[in-house]
Each structure stands twice: as C-alpha cells, then as structure tokens.
Amino acid sequence: MFLRAWGIARSLVMYHGVPGRHRRMLRLYGEFLRPGDVAFDIGAHVGSRVRAWRRLGAHVVAVEPQPDCLRVLRLFFGRDPGVAIVPLAAG
C-alpha cells in the first residue's frame, strides 16, 4: 500500500508539479487542438494531458485501467462535464 501511494505521489509531482511543464504542454498541444475538439488520452495516468487539453478547450475522453490512477482522475476531473473517464484498458 505504501509503495502504491508513494508511486502516485511521485507521479503527481513529476507530471503536475514541475514548473513550466504545463506551459510547454499548452504550447505543444495548442498547435493541434482547438476549443470544442475531442481528444482521447489512452492511458491517462494522473491526467497531466487531460489538464492541458481541457485548458485548451478540448473535450477529453480519458481511458485508464489502473484503480489508483482512476481515483486521481476522478478527484481532479470527476465533476468536469468536458471529461469522460473510462475505467478500461485499450490495446
């Protein structure tokens, strides 16, 4: 249990806590996504791309099979009508 919690905490810091990372993602994905577009995040993990894509105005389908990551996604985006969280694996 401790190692799983540590892994999620590490991912949150790595993907949401690095200064400038979100800004760089907005710059990159802003070249491709426009408000109202639909984007699929297959393997959404802890939602760093979901966050960036929503900021750009895209509707997001976040596919994630891992229960711990699903909890994070639901916590961050569960009430956002522009995000559909799909608790499945794709392959």
Where are these regions (language model features)?
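Phosphate/nucleotide-binding beta-alpha loop and adjacent structural elements of enzyme active sites
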Residues: 1-91
